[in-house]
């Protein structure tokens, strides 16, 4: 985490949409799999905390994803809306466990995924990223998260067809919405929602103040050094970073000796 933060800061990047805090218990998961730290909730949580603390100690905001948990799904939310049918007890012990630990640790950011979780949101048409029950009720109120809340990309098929998408994401409690095909239309949508009383101006201002606070903490007012392209490859690919690359030997696999096919 610290090494990633060092490189990010040199490149002028202050937010990393990582780590993946999903517990990947489904071997058929088409989108998380190797992005996850594994299938054990406690081990995933340990690695999420270590990586996130490394990032934030280096001045880069960590963003744990995909709340409330995308690990046990067989649908890619880029292409559809995955459903988690588990009860609350199971969700608390597996999917939500790493997120609770990162909240307790006081880490900075969470990304909410596009999922349908009946145990948390009874409306089958409302994705977790657009659910006030999930974003505000669970993440903020119950779990006590006070950091920045981001949606996953709103151009993903899990939610992209929802009308008034940006407004619904903000009403759910998200602070920032990611990736709009037409930013100007999204801004106009929010302005109209405020004028019509659908979205509170006070709530929008509170989100803006929160975002500006994090920008300040991440160095908004500090002079931005000019990007030094010369020698960057050597500064990024340090000897220490190379030393972290480990060659693994799989002793369970037996190799077959070659035979002389000419004699067959």
Map each language-model feature to its residues.
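A substrate-binding/cap region within the structured catalytic cores of diverse enzymes
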Residues: 1-13, 18-44, 48, 52, ...
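Generic helix-packing signal
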Residues: 5, 9, 52, 56-58, ...
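Surface-exposed helix-capping loop/turn segments at secondary-structure junctions
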Residues: 13-16, 59-61, 198, 222
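Flexible hinge/switch segments at interdomain interfaces of large molecular machines
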Residues: 20-26, 67-72, 111, 221-228
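Second-shell residues forming the walls of enzyme active-site clefts
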Residues: 42-203
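Preference for extracellular/luminal or secreted protein segments
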Residues: 141, 161-264
């Amino acid at each position: 985490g610290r090494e990633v933060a060092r490189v990010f800061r040199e490149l002028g990047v202050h937010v990393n949409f990582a780590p993946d805090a999903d517990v990947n218990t489904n071997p058929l998961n088409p989108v998380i799999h190797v992005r996850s730290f594994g299938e054990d909730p406690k081990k995933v949580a340990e690695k999420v905390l270590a990586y996130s603390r490394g990032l934030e100690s280096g001045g880069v905001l960590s963003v744990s994803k995909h709340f409330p948990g995308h690990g046990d799904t067989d649908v890619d939310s880029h292409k559809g809306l995955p459903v988690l049918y588990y009860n609350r007890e199971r969700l608390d012990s597996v999917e939500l466990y790493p997120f609770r630990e990162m909240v307790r640790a006081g880490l900075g950011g969470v990304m909410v995924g596009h999922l349908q979780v009946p145990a948390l949101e009874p409306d089958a048409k409302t994705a977790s990223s657009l659910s006030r029950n999930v974003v505000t009720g669970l993440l903020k109120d119950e779990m006590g998260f006070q950091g920045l809340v981001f949606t996953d990309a709103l151009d993903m098929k899990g939610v992209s067809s929802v009308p008034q998408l940006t407004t619904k994401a903000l009403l759910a409690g998200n602070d920032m919405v990611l990736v709009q095909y037409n930013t100007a239309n999204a801004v106009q949508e929010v302005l109209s929602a405020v004028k019509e009383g659908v979205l509170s101006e006070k709530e929008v201002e509170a989100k803006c103040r929160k975002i500006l606070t994090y920008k300040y903490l991440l160095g908004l007012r500090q002079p931005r050094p000019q990007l030094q392209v010369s020698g960057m490859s050597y500064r990024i690919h340090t000897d220490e970073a190379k030393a972290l690359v480990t060659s693994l030997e799989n002793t369970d696999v037996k190799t077959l000796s070659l035979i002389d096919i000419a004699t067959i």
